[in-house]
Each structure stands twice: as C-alpha cells, then as structure tokens.
C-alpha cells in the first residue's frame, strides 16, 4: 500500500509540512464530499480514513480503508472535476491539508520537488488502479470507459512541443495485428507504448479467470505502470487488441534517463501520466454505475461551455497528437 511518509524524500516531506495545514479530525469527520471539487489534497499523517462512493441506487459502497501516508483528493485536483467518493475518518486522525493553489505554484518555485511530488502522485494512482482492477469486475455495468476524447488530449495538454519532440525521438512505429496480444500479465514490459490508432482491451487474471477491466484508446499510454514501480513486477494486466493497433514504442531506458536529468520535463510528464490514470480510475467507476453523485453533479452543471483558454489548450493538444501521428504513420521506422 502506498505510504508517502516512506516514499517521499525528507526534503519533500519537510516542504509539505511547512506549507500545509495540520488538523486533528475526530472520528466520523467528512474530509472530502463526493460530487464536490476539493480545494485541497490531503495527506493522512496519523489515523485511518474510509473512501466510500455511491452506486446508482444511492447506496454507499466502500472502495478502500487507508492508513498513515495515504493521499486523497488528488483526482479532483488533477482533473478539476467533482470527487468520486466521500472520505471520512474512521478514527481520530491527523491530516495535512495542501492547498491546490499552492501545489500548482510548486512547478515554478521548486521544479525538482515538483517532479518528485508528481511522480509520487502517479505512483499512488498506479497502486490505486492495480487494487481497483482486482474488484471492479464485481459491479455490473456497460464496462466501457466514458469520454474517450478526454484521454486523447490529456497527455498532450500538459506536455509542451519540445517534450513531444523529445519523446518522438525515443520511439518507433509498431503495429499489432487484429487479435494479437501486446503485453501479458506478469511478464516483462520492455517498452512504453503510446496508442496512435486502434483500441486495446485490458484483462486481469483473477483466480484463474480473465476479467476485462477496461479499454485504452488513441492518445493513451500502455505499460506506463512499470515506470512507477521500484521492483520489476512485470505487466499488471494483459493487453490485447481485437481490431489491431498502431503504437509508438518508446525506449524505456531513454525515457527514464531524460526524466532523471530534466526535472521540468519530469514534472510535466508525471502530471500528464497522473491525469491519465486519474481519468482511467474515474471511468472504471462510472462505467460500473458507481460515483453516482459525482456523475449527477457534472450532469447538473450548466457551466459546460469552455472558455477561450480551454479551447486553446484543447486545440494545441490535438495538434501535437496529430503531428506525432503523421510523423510515424506516414513512413516512420516500423516494427511488427
């Protein structure tokens, strides 16, 4: 289980404690409310918290019980969308409240700490998705992710043009024939893959039975969780494609080298990765008719019109992805 007090450097922990607000909350205190956008990211310093979501019938469903070092509220911060669950203390607890405005400024103020923070958030979400994959199949629903357009753009909305160019230099085109398998659960993941075209099915073996837990579409990464684990545990799921895919196969060693040498790039890359995984986690819940109050809050929101800044960001992200696709699909180096 993820524990920030173990995972984070002493320097980052000191910065968080100096800039956050410590509060002691009694048993039964609601820290985050499903359906509302959280103004803080929270770190549990001591105690215990429960994470409960709402199903389509309005009943509470427990997602997790978390202990010291847990981080909550990061999904709402990353996506600027309503929280998918209530977070309630299960015992008297000490909680560190981190303002989202403060965290947004960290990139400019402390780029190396920002890169470490974003990587920790990505690792936390990776652990969350791995846990979620183990039980999400128990809930009925269409089982298809919501709003694929968001996923196409999320990586390229955070990265800049030079970042995308740098990633392109690390990659080559790979085609997966219809019905073939890209990754097998538990086996080594030699590269990171960006879907340029097609769709991937994600399967997890649970007690000897393969269960489909999601899909990934163009603009998403595959194999990215291996960047976030301290030990080589192999692929967390099997990835196949019914109709075939075109992928940008990214050299993992080159990518890790660039991430370690360039804090600003690492900050943007891990934030984009976290946004993608946050959406993946949210979509799994929504596809199984969970996070009902969050879904309702977004449906009731009349402020769906995008401002010029958002439209500009979407346009730039789309252009970056289109340029990358053109570069490789029109004659780049190909691997079958």
Q: What are the language-model segments listed below?
A:
Residues 1-336:
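Cytosolic regulatory regions built on CNB/CRP/Popeye-like sensor folds
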